[in-house]
């Protein structure tokens, strides 16, 4: 299952001076309706223009169809205008915030007297459909002066603020202003040409509201004006819009499946983890069943790291603030850290300070502490590459509005390692690390990757430009040699060095950032790290930061959604459950389970008072990969019957064969769910 595909770029069309772009597109034979109808054009400078645009000179433009990313974005922006018109018709007191297109949809913010209800959304959808059916025309109008704009929008305080801040706004979600002109888009009655409604907007827009063939309002929520909690409280309505009903249905099906797979929902249903209010936002606890999965993940990771030559270390959760002054985190990452704890201060009886205290911080990253381990004694080139690894707990102050389940938390455990090597070893270490990353992800059934190269943020970095350029070029070379698609991420690097991140697609086609590999020449300098080279000179090591899971919590959440809670048998908290047809046959299954447990399998017998069919239903809902049933014939034959997650069943399997099948399947770390097919001759091993 994936999102609808986008059409390929169209051939260029010549637009004569004095002719509308829409006329030229029609005369070139492009479709006038359907999902590939042209909704805007792109000029030679890459700017999107309305079809009503009339160039002063002959130009060539690229038609942009509705079923492209840009086409959908324009449709969604226009749908946001239709939503705003509907809201102001139903709630005349509503004041307009902003209404941009976003990934797969749009939203609009409003100042209203109360939150929107589901009934409000249903009523607004009906009004929007009426507006769309009326085929209102979007008409761009340049406002001659700031004074004229202020006068026209005098009753819209948020729009007035945008007008006043016009020159200082750099936010892609603010569509109201931009460029050298102030423009308003009027919605015109197609019969009379009279203005029905209008909004401050830089555009572009579709020709008419009838170019919105499919839309749906999805939800509402609270919001802050311009995302700042110190600003006015607003109400936000989200929606989605597409080039066809079929594309929208496909998207809504994807959303419904994503909701069914939501790891927060499954975490509760499968008793894996929870988020107690008593602990605070972004601080999960893992229950016994979730703890089993987490332990399996960590144990397998340790095994693989030993095979790759890593050495295990452990560091504390808090440190004196000076450490993060040296590393630069307090200068460049303070907003992502929890506030300082001022401790160890001693006072005299009169309240004066006898012994000054010190600021301690929860660690946001492990790298400074690993540097102290490297620096704890002299190092020789013979020790390099030195690969230090730990499951390090770190704490980051994420704003409450962005905390989300396990995928965005405030306390997390990283499978974190730092590699110290010579410059001569650097490229091979990077290449080896990248292959290690990809191999480990494949071991968990994630094998659809691309790479992202995050480069220097010119406003937030330490070190020399030349050093950054060398590090970036080296990472790019290693990434390109992997054969994977490489996507640039300008300005996305941490302050101390560029990074490669592995982007993974899950079963629904969604992209998740997983592993990161960062090259760092700067922290070794700041910590004065040295090793003795083979010629006796002191040299700086190169430092490579890498986390393969990213964090245990995030990886756990992604895996939960990827497998919809039906974890591979080797990860499943309960791998086998015995279900007797009647209580009389339970002892037979207890004997089988005893053998499985002795072989290291997590097995149990469902000894509840429920009837057999209810037990099958319950354990299927708990997504147990192997259910072993036993009735009179099974007991008599020394056999069991297999039942699988998909409902398939194989009867009368001898117990010795059943134990072998289960243990071999788990031992091979198969990621697919077992089915009846695996018991066919030649399939089970």
Curated annotation (Swiss-Prot):
Superkingdom: Bacteria
Record text on cofactor binding: Binds 1 zinc ion per subunit.
UniProt: Zn(2+) binding residues: 367, 418, 545
InterPro entries per UniProt: aa-tRNA-synt_IIb, aa-tRNA-synth_II, aa-tRNA-synth_II/BPL/LPL, Anticodon-bd, Anticodon-bd_dom_sf, TGS, Thr-tRNA-ligase_IIa, Thr/Ala-tRNA-synth_IIc_edit
Catalytic reaction list: tRNA(Thr) + L-threonine + ATP = L-threonyl-tRNA(Thr) + AMP + diphosphate + H(+)
Cofactor: Zn(2+)
Any GO BP: threonyl-tRNA aminoacylation
Keyword set includes Protein biosynthesis: yes
EC number: 6.1.1.3
Ranges for region Catalytic: 262-568
GO molecular function: ATP binding; metal ion binding; threonine-tRNA ligase activity; tRNA binding
Subcellular location: Cytoplasm
Key words, A-Z: Aminoacyl-tRNA synthetase, ATP-binding, Cytoplasm, Ligase, Metal-binding, Nucleotide-binding, Protein biosynthesis, RNA-binding, tRNA-binding, Zinc
A Pfam family hit: HGTP_anticodon
Gene3D superfamilies: 3.30.54.20, Anticodon-binding domain (3.40.50.800), Bira Bifunctional Protein, Domain 2 (3.30.930.10), Threonyl-trna Synthetase, Chain A, domain 2 (3.30.980.10)
Primary role: Catalyzes the attachment of threonine to tRNA(Thr) in a two-step reaction: L-threonine is first activated by ATP to form Thr-AMP and then transferred to the acceptor end of tRNA(Thr). Also edits incorrectly charged L-seryl-tRNA(Thr).
Subunit-structure text: Homodimer.
This protein's name: Threonine--tRNA ligase
Organism listed in the record: Rhodococcus jostii (strain RHA1)
Species classification: Bacteria, Bacillati, Actinomycetota, Actinomycetes, Mycobacteriales
């Amino acid at each position: 299952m994936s999102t609808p595909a986008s059409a390929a770029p169209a051939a260029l069309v010549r637009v004569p001076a004095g002719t509308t772009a829409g006329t030229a597109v029609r005369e070139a034979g492009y479709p006038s309706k359907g999902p590939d109808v042209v909704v805007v054009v792109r000029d030679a400078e890459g700017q999107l223009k309305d079809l009503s645009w009339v160039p002063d000179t002959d130009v060539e433009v690229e038609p942009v169809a509705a079923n492209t990313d840009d086409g959908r974005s324009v449709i969604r922006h226009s749908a946001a205008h239709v939503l705003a018109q509907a809201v102001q018709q139903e709630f005349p007191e509503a004041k307009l915030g902003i209404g941009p297109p976003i990934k797969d949809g749009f939203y609009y913010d409003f100042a209203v007297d109360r939150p929107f209800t589901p009934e409000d959304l249903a009523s607004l959808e009906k009004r929007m459909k009426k507006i769309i059916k009326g085929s209102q025309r979007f008409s761009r109008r340049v406002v001659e002066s700031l004074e004229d704009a202020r006068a026209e929008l005098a009753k819209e305080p948020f729009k007035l603020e945008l007008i006043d801040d016009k020159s200082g706004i750099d936010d892609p979600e603010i569509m109201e202003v931009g460029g050298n002109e102030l423009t308003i888009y009027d919605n015109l009655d197609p019969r009379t040409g009279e203005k029905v409604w209008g909004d401050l907007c830089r555009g572009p827009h579709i020709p008419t509201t009838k170019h919105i063939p499919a839309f749906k309002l999805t939800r509402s929520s609270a919001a802050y004006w311009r995302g700042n909690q110190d600003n006015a409280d607003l109400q936000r309505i989200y929606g989605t819009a597409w080039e066809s009903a079929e594309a929208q249905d496909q998207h809504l099906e994807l959303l419904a499946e994503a909701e069914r797979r939501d790891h927060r929902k499954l975490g509760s249903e499968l008793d894996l983890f929870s988020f107690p209010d008593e602990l605070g936002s972004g601080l999960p606890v893992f229950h016994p069943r979730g703890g089993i999965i987490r332990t399996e993940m960590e144990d397998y990771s340790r095994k693989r790291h030993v095979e790759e030559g890593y050495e295990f270390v452990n560091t504390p959760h808090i440190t004196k603030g000076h450490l993060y002054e040296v590393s630069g985190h307090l200068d460049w990452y303070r907003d992502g850290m929890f506030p300082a704890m001022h401790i160890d201060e001693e006072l005299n009886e009169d309240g004066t300070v006898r012994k000054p205290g010190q600021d301690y911080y929860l660690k946001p990253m492990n790298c400074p502490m690993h540097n102290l381990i490297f620096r704890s004694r002299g190092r020789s080139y013979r020790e390099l590459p030195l690969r230090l690894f730990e499951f390090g707990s770190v704490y980051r102050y994420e704003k409450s509005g962005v905390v989300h389940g396990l995928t965005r938390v405030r306390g997390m455990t990283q499978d974190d390692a730092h590699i110290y090597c010579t410059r001569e070893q650097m490229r091979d270490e990077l290449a080896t690390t990248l292959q290690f990353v990809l191999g480990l992800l494949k071991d968990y059934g994630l094998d659809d990757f691309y790479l992202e190269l995050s480069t220097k943020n010119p406003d937030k970095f330490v070190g020399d430009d030349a050093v950054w350029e060398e590090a970036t070029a080296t990472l790019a070379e290693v990434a390109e040699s992997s054969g994977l698609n490489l996507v640039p991420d300008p300005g996305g690097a941490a302050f101390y060095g560029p990074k490669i991140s592995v982007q993974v697609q899950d079963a629904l086609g969604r992209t998740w950032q997983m592993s990161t590999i960062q090259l760092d020449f700067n922290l070794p300098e700041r910590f004065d790290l040295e090793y003795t080279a083979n010629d006796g000179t002191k040299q700086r090591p190169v430092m490579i930061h890498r986390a393969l899971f990213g964090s245990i919590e995030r990886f756990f959440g992604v895996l939960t959604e990827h497998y919809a809670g039906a974890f591979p048998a080797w990860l499943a908290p309960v791998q086998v459950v015995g279900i007797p047809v009647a209580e009389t046959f339970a002892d037979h299954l207890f004997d089988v389970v005893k053998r499985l447990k002795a072989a290291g399998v997590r097995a149990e017998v469902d000894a509840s008072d429920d009837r057999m069919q209810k037990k099958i239903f319950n354990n299927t809902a708990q997504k147990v990969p192997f259910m072993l049933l036993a009735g009179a014939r099974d007991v008599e034959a020394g056999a069991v019957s297999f039942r699988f997650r998909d409902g398939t069943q194989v009867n009368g399997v001898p117990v010795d064969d059943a134990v072998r099948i289960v243990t071999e399947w788990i031992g091979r770390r198969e990621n697919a769910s077992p089915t009846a097919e695996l018991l066919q001759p030649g399939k089970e091993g």
